[in-house]
Amino acid sequence: MQNSSPVSSTPDALPDSQPDSQPDDALRLGPVQAAQRLVLLHGWGADADDLLDLGELLVGPEVSVVALRAPEPHPSGSGRQWYSLQPIDWSALPAARLALRQRLERLAASVALENTVLLGFSQGSAMAIDVGCGLPLAGIVGCSGYPHQGWQAAGALPPVLLSHGREDPVVPFEASEELRRQLLQAGGQVELLPFSGGHGIDPELLPDLGAFVRRCLRGED
């Protein structure tokens, strides 16, 4: 579940990035002191740098962009994972969920969760929806994701925007349809943007994704 960003990104190409308190766990773009933030969760087998260029395209220079690195090494020896998918280890999910929640709460010390949008791709999208729906976030973007086993939407949900390719061979399009169904059933505000394509983020949807993120950060959704 790699190559999710429409443009490549590497840490060496980020001269204006800001060091994180745990530099191996996150990459940053934007001002050190910001009022708003976009947090990025990469997919299975990718790394923190994978979505940075995408994040920069979606928000203005005044917004802090933080790309988190998944805690576990990918079994291929390259990239990272939020939990094992080969084989799927659902028993590791509670710890992964708690670890991500704690990282987001630490980030909230500088930018409030109410002023933060969480965006994830594939496995990162599953984590964003699972953890983010239990936090007072400004919004969530889930790209080519899926619902975790046993997950149920509940409580006061942030606005959610989903995108998914109808021909996705990795995560079936129906997974996002199921997410949409569950979120609507729980009273959430959710939109699903389908596109003709496979497992990725459609460049033609970037204006829609950016508009949603900016509306959420302005408190309009």
Give the ranges of each region predicted by the language model.
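A short loop-to-beta-strand scaffold at the N-terminal edge of the catalytic core in hydrolase folds
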Residues: N3-G30
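Serine-hydrolase catalytic machinery in alpha/beta-hydrolase-like enzymes
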Residues: D20-N115
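Active-site signature of alpha/beta-hydrolase-fold catalytic machinery across serine-
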Residues: D53, D130-V131
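Gly/Ala-rich beta-loop-alpha elbow adjacent to hydrolase catalytic centers
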Residues: L119-G124, A128
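A conserved short beta-strand
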Residues: P136-G145
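Short, proline-enriched alpha-helix->beta-strand connector loops that line the catalytic pocket
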Residues: G155-V160, A186
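Short beta-strand/loop motif that positions the catalytic acidic residue
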Residues: L162-H164, D168
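C-terminal catalytic histidine-bearing segment of alpha/beta-hydrolase fold enzymes
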Residues: E174-D221
